[in-house]
């Protein structure tokens, strides 16, 4: 299976992503930034995440939330109005569509490629992707005990902001 999937994976990553998000840090984590690119792949989506400025090396919860945009509220340490984890079929945690594997940071940087068959790119356009301060424990309801929101980005069709195509951790960032 891997021998058959790898060429498709490389072909997919050589294309432009369909949905993108630029991650910004919360008021308590202003140096956190990054990008997430989403590609259609098999029966779902392939997500590529590159996040810098994480507070420490370790694990962080990583979830798609119900709505965007990500707005930092005055006097509020997270992001306002993004709702709970994305769950169109109202599944309990960790089975809802917005559940993603934890981000693993080393020297304040995390890079991840993950496949999900729980959604296609068009279903997450306009929704928020959130980095949480603690790792998801995959048990506690409704959020996996992943703590506060330290970073957030809103998914948009990539062509709207003319992103550069990702080419790995050393690529150019999205234009401002």
Task: Spell out what each predicted region is.
Residues 1-176:
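N-terminal leader/targeting pre-sequences
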